[in-house]
Amino acid sequence: MSVLFTLKQYVKMVIQNKYLPYIYQKACKKPVKKGKILFADAHHTELTGNMKPVYQKLKNGGYDIQLYCEDIQTMPVWRMIAFMKEFMQVYAQAEYVFINSYFLPVSSCRKRKETTVVQLWHSGGLMKKMGYDTTEDIPKYYKGNPTANYDLVTVSASCCEAVWEKALHLSQGTAKALGLARTDIYFDKEWNADNKCRFYQRYPEARNKKICVYAPSFEGNAAHPYNRGIESGILDIMKHLEKEWFFIIKVHPHMEKNYPMYHCDFSTEELFAVTDLLITDYSSVVYDYLIYQKSFLLY
């Protein structure tokens, strides 16, 4: 693990454990506002995953909704701190907060009881360790609890509840099998047909070929991700089969900077409609793909 990464973690801990709680406590002088809802994401500049359909459902309900979505990995430190400060000031008066993955400001303080934090966890299942079950996700030296203050964590099935509670150090009953809002779109015939049409317009050379999507996960952590699959010889296999197959390599969002040559204009979800074979390693994308009842290969 690099010295720079470790240094960043310590700076992050100081901000999370000292500065943000101070900002929150000052803002708590004002009461919680009924109907005030926040959607927050520190990895994307727009709503993604389960948050998007939940927002669409709530936006016309007369609620006071605010979005806090930024990719903090791309922000200068001063902007990141300003973003978190603004969030904490509003967090102190929010009735509900929705997040889609780790969002450290939410867990940086002891929140008010009147505020409910809902973690709309993004994956449909697990094929690898996460959270406190792996030191790569949450280093042992990290002081703080990135999953504190969660009142509800939504998961895809009852068999996932105990697994999530163990991995994220949640109280029993916090994880509930309420399903994933984002998977509803997979049953929309018009959406699937539109994705097919756009795909063949973008890749006319894929017509009359079988479509294979290679969508590996990543190893390491979000700050220093890596992937062994792409370097393991799978590209040679693709080359031998390119007469009959059209291959799309869809790397994990954390890996896009490392592999810009594999950029694809379509999200993995949008590719499902045209995919004949999905190849992945231990990515949770396979749980989504199973809805289409098509072939997949773990490599």
Regions found by a protein language model. Give the residues of each.
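A short, charged/proline- and glycine-enriched loop
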Residues: 29-38, 62, 114, 207-210, ...
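Membrane-proximal basic amphipathic "stem/tether" segments
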Residues: 1-38, 42-43
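Donor nucleotide-activated moiety binding/catalytic core segment of transferases
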Residues: 81-96, 251-287, 291-292
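Structural loop-to-beta junction motif characteristic of Rossmann-like glycosyltransferase folds
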Residues: 115, 277, 293-297
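Short active-site oxyanion
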Residues: 148-153, 246, 274-277
